Swiss-Prot record:
Keywords: Ribonucleoprotein, Ribosomal protein, RNA-binding, rRNA-binding. It holds the Pfam family Ribosomal_L22. GO terms for cellular component: cytosolic large ribosomal subunit. Part of the 50S ribosomal subunit. The lineage of its organism: Bacteria, Pseudomonadati, Pseudomonadota, Alphaproteobacteria, Hyphomicrobiales. This is Large ribosomal subunit protein uL22. One of its GO terms (molecular function) is rRNA binding. It comes from Bradyrhizobium diazoefficiens (strain JCM 10833 / BCRC 13528 / IAM 13628 / NBRC 14792 / USDA 110). CDD domains: Ribosomal_L22. SUPFAM superfamilies: Ribosomal protein L22. Belongs to the universal ribosomal protein uL22 family.
Length: 129
């Protein structure tokens, strides 16, 4: 016996991928996520390829995973995919200390983030508009 299947939270023309434990602050990750929101998947991949941000490599990997999920798991056409949503969440925060003057210490926060990308298949006419 197994658990009953859970209802699919996405529409039939959508697929998603989640990247967790990304070692960057959510604020910096959101700058890169804003680049790809609402863009066609191929254009978003090209933008990430030539972005100078360090975290763009991990965002590109997550987007490629979402595209692969759409193609292999949900039988969607890769050429008609659009980045419907790209949102950032908080992860854990490692707390470290740095030595300061006069024998004191200061806190250093090392934040982690998570990224969720949802791609949606749209018709060719709607994507061109």
């Amino acid at each position: 016996m197994s658990k009953p299947k859970r209802e699919r939270s996405l529409a039939e023309n959508e697929a998603k991928a989640v990247a967790r434990m990304l070692r960057v602050s959510p604020q910096k990750l959101n700058l890169v996520a804003q680049l790809i929101r609402g863009r066609k998947a191929a254009a978003a991949l090209a933008d990430l390829q030539f972005s100078r941000k360090r975290i763009a490599v991990d965002v590109k990997k997550c987007l490629e995973s979402a595209i692969a999920n759409a193609e292999n798991n949900h039988d969607l056409d890769v050429d008609d995919l659009v980045v419907a949503q790209a949102f950032v969440g908080n992860g854990l925060v490692m707390k470290r200390f740095a030595a300061r003057g006069r024998g004191r210490s200061g806190r250093v926060y090392k934040p982690f983030s998570q990224l969720t990308i949802i791609v949606r298949q749209v018709e060719a006419e709607a994507a061109a508009a």
